[in-house]
Regions:
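N-terminal auxiliary segments of SAM/dcSAM-dependent transferases
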Residues: 2-94
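A short hydrophobic/small-residue beta-strand
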Residues: 16, 160, 232-233
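SAM-dependent Rossmann-like transferase core, predominantly class I methyltransferases
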Residues: 63-133
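Class I S-adenosyl-L-methionine
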Residues: 6, 10, 39-46, 69, ...
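Conserved SAM/SAH cofactor-binding pocket of Class I
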Residues: 106, 110-198
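S-adenosylmethionine
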Residues: 121, 129, 166-273
Length: 274
């Protein structure tokens, strides 16, 4: 039920969700919040006989920041037996080939969510055994959140990584994480959206972990910046949305390669075979 409501809220500019027992918390920029739209949505939910109540309040960025810095101690996450993601104060951190430190500060991308975890696994496979590693390998990470995907790509061998995040506070968090991992010389973090693309730079690999509506709206920009034979990996949508994503990508000249899903969250991979 929570997944259905989250999917219906996404077009209303809600981009982050968390569930606690019988409560769904949804987050959107304050200037995008519309109580009338939320009320209309809840009045039309396809759940008969179920009563919903809701409330809203504005969350101060500094409060979240302080809370995370003081309390977050998430368990280390192991991805594909090769990558360990952990916080600054995580305990019992195992040794892995790729060690990544993340201070999430409420930004999306600690590696816990199915979309992030699956993309991390795909990045490991993309660079497996030195494959695709070269002095010219470039990666674009759209909607980078904590920049964990960009950081792993750089760790695996990408020589140049560009990470773009629309939220200025989240972009600052991404920059902090890049510095924490000693990758300031490899990763450039910018605040903005797909309008920053199209400057002539081409990428071997484009990662986009956002949401269905943004992916559909901006996919042409991602593809325009791919090198010949480049790879596009997208996530942030449900498995039932795959036909829509696939149709859009193929209409733009991309070749569908494969997809995978975990708890209905899906990653789709396409190739710009020219």
């Amino acid at each position: 039920m929570a997944d259905v409501i989250a999917a219906m809220l996404a077009p209303l500019d809600y981009d982050s969700f968390s569930s606690e027992e019988d409560c769904l918390k949804a987050y959107c920029p304050a200037d995008k919040y519309s109580p009338s739209k939320v009320a209309d949505l809840l009045d039309n939910l396809p759940f008969h006989g179920v009563e919903f109540t809701w409330s809203a309040h504005e969350v101060e960025t500094q409060d979240w920041n302080a809370e995370w810095e003081e309390t977050v101690k998430f368990e280390p996450i192991i991805i594909g037996d090769k990558c360990c993601i952990h916080g600054l104060n995580s305990e019992n951190v195992p040794q892995c080939k790729y060690d990544i430190i993340i201070a999430p500060k409420m930004s999306f991308g600690s590696g816990h969510h199915e979309t992030t975890a699956q993309l991390l696994e795909e990045i490991l496979m993309y660079f497996d055994d030195g494959k695709n590693v070269s002095s010219e390998c470039s990666v674009l990470d759209m909607g980078c959140g904590t920049a964990v995907l960009a950081i792993l790509a750089a760790r695996c061998g990408a020589s140049k990584v560009r990470a773009i995040e629309i939220d200025d506070w989240v972009a600052d968090n991404a920059k902090d994480n890049v510095l924490l991992n000693g990758l300031a010389g490899k990763i450039i973090v910018e605040c903005g959206d797909a309008s920053l693309l199209g400057n002539g730079t081409r990428y071997d690999l484009v990662l986009a972990n956002i949401n269905r509506n943004v992916l559909l709206a901006d996919m042409h920009s991602y593809i325009s910046d791919l090198k010949a034979n480049g790879t596009l990996m997208m996530s942030g949508f449900y498995e039932e949305d795959l036909p829509m994503i696939k149709k859009c990508a193929e209409s733009l000249g991309m070749k569908y390669v494969r997809h995978r899903s975990r708890n209905n969250w899906t990653v789709a991979i396409f190739s710009a075979e020219i």
